[in-house]
Amino acid sequence: MAAKLWNLLLVAASVHLVGSVEQLHQDLIHEFSCGHKYYRTFHLDEKRESLYVGALDKVYKLNLTNISLSDCERDSLTLEPTNIANCVSKGKSADFDCKNHIRVIQPMGDGSRLYICGTNAHSPKDWVVYSNLTHLQRHEYVPGIGVGIAKCPFDPEDSSTAVWVENGNPGDLPGLYSGTNAEFTKADTVIFRTDLYNLTTGRREYSFKRTLKYDSKWLDNPNFVGSFDVGEYVLFFFRETAVEYINCGKSVYSRVARVCKKDVGGKNILSQNWATFLKARLNCSIPGEFPFYFNEIQGVYKMPNTDKFFGVFSTSVTGLTGSAICSFTLKDIQEVFSGKFKEQATSSSAWLPVLPSRVPDPRPGECVNDTELLPDTVLNFIRSHPLMDGAVSHEGGKPVFYKRDVLFTQLVVDKLKVNLVGKNMEYIVYYAGTSTGQVYKVVQWYDSGGLPQSLLVDIFDVTPPEPVQALHLSKEYKSLYAASDNIVRQIELVMCHHRYSNCLQCARDPYCGWDRDSNSCKSYTPGLLQDVTNTSANLCEHSVMKKKLIVTWGQSIHLGCFLKVPEVLSSQTISWVHYTKDKGRYPIVYRPDKYIETSEHGLVLISVTDSDSGRYDCWLGGSLLCSYNITVDAHRCSAPGRSNDYQKIYSDWCHEFERSKIAMKTWERKQAQCSTKQNNSNQKTHPNDIFHSNPVA
């Protein structure tokens, strides 16, 4: 009976739990916070060793080496909102909506000046300041600065994007490109370029350009996530209601839009609007006969000095949650913009590709020296046909990585080149922030056949439980910078020694290598063990924990490789194998009366006998995690030979248990008597009492 009860308890304890996220070592983290300030905008300037953070009524300048050394007052610029009363009178909250949330920080020229735009109590306003966060001198007036409408949002909760472009604009004059809401009511969303001024004379040379107002074919309730200056174009990434799907129901698609930097609009048609605006769908999906789409882009990153764009996408937040990382090339994007256009003949018609014979010349959307010279046929076509028929395919035809029950919010990417046994390996490392304040670290490489492969290397907390609102990476300072509404954290990219205690995990991190001499994880240098691609099954075998145990007959024992299984390994198949002289090698099949799997993928052996002797190996795929050599000592506790022996042992156990119960009751009775005497004693006045009752008549 007791044995059955013990087995049931073990079974209950073996219920599978989700793998744990191991906390980062404190030496890997620096942090900065001045309270609940909504830190949502980053601009990183390695030249000035600074991370600029846009927050509530403030811009902070943090030390890139160690953000903890920064001071809330000394290293900040205060930009108080104006006309708060008017904002409150419109039904907005004084403590959040009617503050000045800084949403744009962009370098101007060589970076010695910064362009800043904030919500300013639902009345957007912009500034130009020095990079040391001091205001310009009075004589350094910058024309066109002061009103931030269409440059950053009214509502601090609205998504927006902006990029300052120095070169390639009309007259080669600098200006801001933005994607945001341009009205208090949010009815007018816009992709916008500011008026272009000659900064020497202060004269306006070119008027602003924008998307067509209130036209769902151009923009339909977009959420902007990024914008980039790329050659003769500016690219915008966003998600919006899919106008081409509206007849079948409401759905959201991810988009990339393109405008030419030299665009000055049309002469009579589209005179204030873009004459080169095009947009296309971004395809991030799991391939198959019926592809599974991650339709909603949440964040985008362009790796410096490359033509690659990396995005995090999610399923609809109203359904089952899932997220994916997909990559796109500029070449694939441009090919779609050079392809067929899409149109809807009538409001009830299906959206179909436009026949090539109906596309005017010069081709709509192509960059020309002067868009005012474009014929009306081209301008009318672009006005009614901004959408391309094809979708931009993701690299490799599949996501880099995808995961259910996770919402990715931000993404940054690093590239590593490693000399591995005379062979140069290139790894792309993705850091994806989540809505619960974690970062997923994924590594990608190309196999010998040129096919992309990826592996989840680590998961760690950065801002739990709050979402990661901003994320940036510095190769020079070897740090990852993440922000939530409450805190900014800096995490070292190379976290080997403080992160991995075993060879298996260490060897899978492209920044790290296992030192067999010191039996520790170090920053990778040639000669250390590394196996990111998981092709060397026996690489870590010499470092595997191997133990010898001598157990007595009838004893139950626990074999395990981890105190806590890292979450990155929790979803992988971990198996146990038993080696004996008689049976050879055979896999352990779990059953409640003999072999029980623990929540950390350990193994419990119930009531061992001679046949349980031998070696027990724990495997993760083709990698050995740990090994135990078990010897059953039958001399110290021999097996009962007959049923009478079992009955005698059981009877002895029952008598012992009964004696223990009697002893416990005796102790409880005496304890109660002592308590009663103590209470009676405390009620009497002691002659040495310092305080006593002495009522005054």
UniProtKB/Swiss-Prot annotation:
<dbReference type="InterPro" id="IPR001627">
    <property type="entry name" value="Semap_dom"/>
</dbReference>
<feature type="glycosylation site" description="N-linked (GlcNAc...) asparagine">
    <location>
        <position position="369"/>
    </location>
</feature>
<feature type="signal peptide">
    <location>
        <begin position="1"/>
        <end position="20"/>
    </location>
</feature>
<keyword id="KW-1015">Disulfide bond</keyword>
<feature type="glycosylation site" description="N-linked (GlcNAc...) asparagine">
    <location>
        <position position="132"/>
    </location>
</feature>
<feature type="disulfide bond">
    <location>
        <begin position="618"/>
        <end position="654"/>
    </location>
</feature>
<dbReference type="InterPro" id="IPR036179">
    <property type="entry name" value="Ig-like_dom_sf"/>
</dbReference>
<feature type="glycosylation site" description="N-linked (GlcNAc...) asparagine">
    <location>
        <position position="679"/>
    </location>
</feature>
<dbReference type="GO" id="GO:0005576">
    <property type="term" value="C:extracellular region"/>
</dbReference>
<keyword id="KW-0393">Immunoglobulin domain</keyword>
<comment type="similarity">
    <text>Belongs to the semaphorin family.</text>
</comment>
<feature type="domain" description="Ig-like C2-type">
    <location>
        <begin position="526"/>
        <end position="634"/>
    </location>
</feature>
<protein>
    <recommendedName>
        <fullName>Semaphorin-2A</fullName>
    </recommendedName>
</protein>
<feature type="glycosylation site" description="N-linked (GlcNAc...) asparagine">
    <location>
        <position position="283"/>
    </location>
</feature>
<feature type="glycosylation site" description="N-linked (GlcNAc...) asparagine">
    <location>
        <position position="198"/>
    </location>
</feature>
<feature type="disulfide bond">
    <location>
        <begin position="506"/>
        <end position="521"/>
    </location>
</feature>
<feature type="glycosylation site" description="N-linked (GlcNAc...) asparagine">
    <location>
        <position position="66"/>
    </location>
</feature>
<feature type="disulfide bond">
    <location>
        <begin position="496"/>
        <end position="512"/>
    </location>
</feature>
<feature type="glycosylation site" description="N-linked (GlcNAc...) asparagine">
    <location>
        <position position="63"/>
    </location>
</feature>
<dbReference type="GO" id="GO:0030215">
    <property type="term" value="F:semaphorin receptor binding"/>
</dbReference>
<feature type="disulfide bond">
    <location>
        <begin position="284"/>
        <end position="326"/>
    </location>
</feature>
<keyword id="KW-0325">Glycoprotein</keyword>
<keyword id="KW-0221">Differentiation</keyword>
<feature type="domain" description="Sema">
    <location>
        <begin position="21"/>
        <end position="493"/>
    </location>
</feature>
<dbReference type="InterPro" id="IPR007110">
    <property type="entry name" value="Ig-like_dom"/>
</dbReference>
<dbReference type="GO" id="GO:0007411">
    <property type="term" value="P:axon guidance"/>
</dbReference>
<feature type="region of interest" description="Disordered">
    <location>
        <begin position="673"/>
        <end position="697"/>
    </location>
</feature>
<feature type="disulfide bond">
    <location>
        <begin position="260"/>
        <end position="367"/>
    </location>
</feature>
<feature type="glycosylation site" description="N-linked (GlcNAc...) asparagine">
    <location>
        <position position="629"/>
    </location>
</feature>
<keyword id="KW-0217">Developmental protein</keyword>
<comment type="function">
    <text>Acts as a chemorepulsive guidance molecule critical for axon fasciculation and for determining both the initial direction and subsequent pathfinding events of the Ti axon projection.</text>
</comment>
<dbReference type="Pfam" id="PF01403">
    <property type="entry name" value="Sema"/>
</dbReference>
<dbReference type="InterPro" id="IPR036352">
    <property type="entry name" value="Semap_dom_sf"/>
</dbReference>
<feature type="compositionally biased region" description="Polar residues">
    <location>
        <begin position="673"/>
        <end position="685"/>
    </location>
</feature>
<dbReference type="GO" id="GO:0030335">
    <property type="term" value="P:positive regulation of cell migration"/>
</dbReference>
<keyword id="KW-0524">Neurogenesis</keyword>
<keyword id="KW-0964">Secreted</keyword>
<feature type="glycosylation site" description="N-linked (GlcNAc...) asparagine">
    <location>
        <position position="534"/>
    </location>
</feature>
<dbReference type="GO" id="GO:0045499">
    <property type="term" value="F:chemorepellent activity"/>
</dbReference>
<dbReference type="InterPro" id="IPR027231">
    <property type="entry name" value="Semaphorin"/>
</dbReference>
<feature type="disulfide bond">
    <location>
        <begin position="87"/>
        <end position="98"/>
    </location>
</feature>
<dbReference type="InterPro" id="IPR015943">
    <property type="entry name" value="WD40/YVTN_repeat-like_dom_sf"/>
</dbReference>
